Each structure stands twice: as C-alpha cells, then as structure tokens.
Amino acid sequence: MKFNMVTTLKEDSKLLRIDTEDGIDNCMGSIPNYNELKKQIDLNKWYYTDKKIPYVHNEYGYRCDTIDSIYENDYILTFGCSYSYGEGLFYEDVYSTKLAKKLDLKNINLAIPGSGISPQVYNTILFNNNFNKIRLPKYVIYQYPNDYRVSLSTYEETRNHLDIDTFTAGDIKEYDQNGYIFDYYLENDGEKKLKDLLFPLYLNNVWETLNVPVFHITFSDYNQEFKSKYQSFEILDIVD
C-alpha cells in the first residue's frame, strides 16, 4: 500500500480527492513507529502478527463511511494523518471508528496518510462549503501531524487540476533541497510559525461559530512553537 499519497483538487472538487486504491497490507513495517513498537512487545503473541489488513475507501478515497451517508445520519468528523487513517490497523480498531460506534454515529474520517496540517485546512474549507449545509457533525476531531511536513501544489495543465504533495523532514534529500522549504522552514522557520499561530485558531473557530464541539489532539509529533494569545484551547498530546 502507498501511504504518502498525492491528493488532487479541481475547480468543482467538494473535497480533496486521494489518489489511492483498495488493497491488502500484510507488512507490519508500515505501522507508524514500528521499530520502537517491536522493542516493547512479543511479536509471537501480538494480535496483528502475520495478519492481512484490508484497506477499503469511499467515493472520495477516504477510509470511512461514504460521504453521502450524512444525508440521513448524524456523524463524527475526523481530520488527521496516518494515525487517524489507521495505517497498520483493522478498520474497526481505528480510534475514529471506535468512537463512532460507541456514539452510534457515522464515521467520516478525512485523514490522509503522510499529510501535514495544510490539507486539513483545505479540507475544512471544502467540507464547510459543501456539506455543512446538509448536516453538521456532532463532533469534530483534529489530529495534528508532524509540524514540519510541508504541502506544496503543482498545476497540471493538461488535466486542469492541482496536485498537492507533502514533503517530510524524514526525507532529507527532497526536503532540504527544495529552495522554498530551505528558506522558510529551515534557514528561517517563519512559515512554520505562521501556521502554528493561525491554523489552529482557524480550525477551532470554524466549528465554534457553528456550536459544534471540536477536539484538538496530537500523537506527540506536533510542536506548536508560536501560539496566539487568543487561543483558548490546548492541543492535547494523548500519548502522555
């Protein structure tokens, strides 16, 4: 399975569309933090050892209920990266799936593996524009990914759409050789701090003005280095 996914955006897009296919993964190495995990558990006794994990996606390429299901059902809405997508997990073991089942809600999980914070902002804009008027979510969760993931877009003229790709600090060759990333994230991290300051405020305010409860979480990999004095909430590290 390909977990660092390119997303596309067209003039008539209702959501970012993920370039992915349904498939089966039996490689435990795809699990986030697998090398650290295997030091702590007995793989011979672990439930997931040698299991084949199916990945099935909806009409927009997301691993969740169909977006059309919100016409008739209440739902929980989740944004995030591979932690929320459930990379290396059965669908029923993903936290958003468990929450939806516990609360008797549909599971609308817009997590994109390998993505940064910017695609969450883009999808929030699109979702708010195209689906909130149908039915508001009961709850919204933002799982903040690694804060040094940078999303950049290129325009495909022949197909008239934007490709949005994410560069990660883990891939140093691509990351520090990009002039924009080097200038605004490494030599001077002003662009990163700009997103730290404004993106959480925006994501929270969208739902707060609609009276929808919103929760901000991270799995110990988002470091908000520049926080607005007007930010009244914390991004909760649920690993601690």
Positions of the model-derived regions?
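N-terminal secretory targeting modules
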Residues: 1-76, 134-135, 149-188, 204, ...
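Serine-esterase "nucleophile elbow" of acetyl-processing enzymes
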Residues: 56-125, 129
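Surface-exposed cleft-lining segments at the edges of enzyme active sites
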Residues: 82-87, 112, 179-197
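Short, solvent-exposed loop/turn segments at secondary-structure junctions
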Residues: 83-85, 113-117, 145-149, 219-224
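Hydrophobic anchor at the start of a short beta-strand
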Residues: 105-107, 138, 212-215
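Well-ordered, non-membrane alpha-helical segments in soluble/globular domains
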Residues: 121-125, 190-203
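Short, structured active-site "lid" loops
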Residues: 132, 138-143
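Conserved, well-ordered alpha-helix/loop/beta-strand core segments that scaffold catalytic motifs
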Residues: 142-143, 197-240
